């Protein structure tokens, strides 16, 4: 559901006439905080071009209360979200999309085919590369131009999704405790 409204959304309701961009995010991850304002700017630009946007938080809020639904509402308001910010309490949506980290991005075309799964851009909290959203923007431009998907999609880097113990997927490898 969307904590701000209580509404439940389907992919069909979220998708624009030209596709859908999904970001698995959370409120506390430094990688998300680093890029979120540029993500919002790109969302505004491409929503006008018929691409739907959604952000989804799937973190375990018992262990990470800063990602709880009420904090999500505040985070979305603070950053001027123009799209739903959904809470995946069961973590089933994150599992269905093979989400691994925050931010984790995917773009789907109008026929629901995944045309991009990769990083927002080359900027990281610890480097001097400006936040631009270049990789995502190139993927969205290719989608709108009906061009083939970008051939070299670099995976997202960020904080691991905070899985509930019984939900951790087989593709998740936790850090060893030191």
Question: Where in the sequence are the language-model features?
Answer:
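Chalcogenol-based redox active-site neighborhoods
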Residues: 1-144, 148-152, 167, 178
């Amino acid at each position: 559901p969307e904590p701000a409204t209580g509404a439940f959304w389907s992919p069909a309701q979220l998708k624009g006439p030209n596709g859908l961009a999904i970001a698995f995010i959370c409120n506390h991850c430094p990688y998300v905080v680093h890029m979120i304002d540029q993500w919002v700017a790109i969302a505004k630009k491409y929503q006008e071009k018929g691409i739907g946007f959604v952000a989804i938080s799937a973190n375990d809020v018992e262990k990470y209360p800063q990602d709880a639904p009420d904090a999500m509402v505040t985070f979305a308001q603070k950053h001027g979200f123009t799209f739903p910010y959904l809470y995946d309490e069961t973590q089933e949506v994150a599992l269905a999309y093979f989400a691994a980290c925050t931010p984790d991005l995917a773009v789907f075309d109008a026929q629901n085919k995944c045309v991009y799964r990769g990083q927002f851009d080359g900027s990281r909290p610890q480097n001097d590369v400006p936040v631009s959203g270049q990789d995502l923007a190139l993927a969205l431009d290719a989608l709108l131009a009906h061009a083939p998907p970008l051939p070299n999609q670099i995976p997202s880097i960020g904080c691991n999704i905070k899985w509930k113990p019984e939900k951790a997927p087989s593709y998740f490898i936790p850090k060893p405790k030191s």
